[in-house]
Regions:
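Exposed beta-sheet edge/beta-hairpin loop segments within beta-rich domains
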Residues: 1-3, 77-78, 169
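Alpha-helical scaffold segments that mediate packing/assembly in large oligomeric complexes
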Residues: 1-72
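Hydrophobic, aliphatic-enriched repeat segments that assemble into extended interaction scaffolds
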Residues: 9, 85-88
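An acidic- and aromatic-residue-enriched active-site/binding cleft used to recognize and process polar
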Residues: 24, 89-91
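Sequence/fold signature of self-assembling virion shell proteins
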Residues: 40-64, 83-84, 91-169
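A generic local secondary-structure boundary/capping motif
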Residues: 72-77, 117
Length: 169
């Protein structure tokens, strides 16, 4: 019974994640990546695109969600800035690894402070990956899939239950 209850709990949380993803996809303002070199629109993710998003969040007085991780005297590590969340699909992990300034989670001075789904950080964005991340099929100018990355600050949205129905604001 306990195992079945635990599995149902996981299923519930995944359903809530899918509902939240769909809500964000239908309501969020967007900034297309344009600094890449693949000849498509939107392009692949670059550091310049990340900087544009961070400037937009700062310009709208968004509060960061996570505190910085101070640097330590350890080989192969780098300090991590205060950060917003960037929620994305697992298919983007290879692309993130090639972005200038990307810090993998295992390169944090204290990787145990990272979230389980966290892949790494670029500037003031810490990327959380999920296999149920948002994809818009054949939406680029050249017909490629567009992977949506939801970049959020603290209290950017809330999910509540009303009359037994799940709702995101």
């Amino acid at each position: 019974l306990n195992e079945a209850a635990a599995r149902l709990g996981v299923s519930l949380r995944q359903t809530e994640d899918e509902l939240t993803r769909d809500m964000l996809a239908s309501t969020a303002a967007f900034i297309n990546c344009t600094a890449g070199v693949n000849g498509d629109n939107p392009t692949e993710l670059t550091r310049s695109d990340v900087d544009d998003v961070v400037r937009a969040l700062l310009g709208n007085n968004a509060y960061t969600i996570l505190d910085n991780i101070e640097g330590e005297d350890k080989f192969g590590t780098a300090p991590v800035r205060d950060a917003y969340f960037a929620l994305c699909h697992t298919d983007l992990t290879k692309d993130m690894d090639s972005v200038d300034g990307f810090i993998q989670k295992n390169q944090y001075p204290s990787p145990m402070n990272a979230l389980r789904s966290e892949w790494g950080a670029i500037g003031n964005l810490r990327f959380l990956v999920s296999s149920i991340g948002s994809i818009t099929q054949s939406a680029s100018n050249l017909g490629a899939n567009v992977y949506n990355i939801f970049c959020v600050g603290m209290e950017a949205y809330a999910c509540i239950e009303q009359d037994g129905k799940y709702c995101c604001l």
